[in-house]
Amino acid sequence: MTEFLKLKKSNCKNCYKCIRNCPVKSIRFSAGQANIVGDECIICGQCFVVCPQNAKEIVSGVETVRVLLSGDAPVYASVAPSFIANYNGAGIESLQTALQALGFAGAEETAIGATHVKTEYERLLAEEGRDILISSCCYSINLLIQKYYPDLLPCLADVVSPMQAHCLDLKRRHPGAKTVFIGPCVAKKDEADHYQGIVDAVLTFEELSGWLTEAGIAIAPGPHAESDESRARLFPTTGGILKTMACAQPGYTYLALDGVESCKAALEDIRNGNLHRCFIEMSACIGSCVGGPVM
């Protein structure tokens, strides 16, 4: 996989905080430096959050997006609904105006894709014989299961993430367009890279804020318009997926878990046969996406 989290060796002061806080112990200390083991990393960004020396660096997508904007194809932004927590007082219309000033053709909330995803979850739960179903929205959780619980992959919903669902929808409605996801998550960069042709680039809120500041563009406060996808705006909060779903399957339990340790505990319970007939919403970040590493 492409490395989207890198170490600035000159900044590392050997404090071991990243090693102690990595939930899957994918950081090794060698030759006087902490090193991320890519094949074991789930890209949760916790090492980036806890590093006091700014020795962890997220690879920026700004130049990639600049290249897209310089081309002939229109570029549309899919904006994670957690932007409300990052850009206080701004609605999607205000954010779209700022993005259009950068050269984007338009911007929409990823909640449009989330609506499609929750419908697919409801359909899967209605299938006869369904036992455990785990949400597939959080790419770090998907990687956790793929790398550390591969025997539980049949439990992971075979449904694209809201990011992919929305960008596929944008490309269907705007043939030939390019798509850029903007959100609080570094793992989405790897997801976009892994599933080529759906999401053409990913920016974090931090990258977008820096770019707007550099360009002298301010996001004006504005109302948050109601839409058919308003309930799907709950997706980035803990339990948000469940709040959008019709949780009515008889005999089913619906759980919402956030934080890698809580999710690992549940996965161990599933592996040991202690959980049955459950839909489990899992998020790697405590607080779900609104607690993302790059808010």
Regions found by a protein language model. Name each.
Residues 1-2, 8-9, 27, 37-38, ...:
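Short, intrinsically disordered, charge-biased short linear motifs at domain edges
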Residues 1, 20, 30, 44, ...:
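Generic signal for short, ordered secondary-structure residues
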Residues 4-9, 13-42, 46-62, 293-295:
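Iron-sulfur cluster-binding cysteine motifs and their immediate structural context
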Residues 59-295:
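Iron-sulfur-associated redox domains of electron-transfer enzymes in respiratory
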Residues 1, 14-20, 40-54, 93, ...:
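Short charge-dense sequence patches
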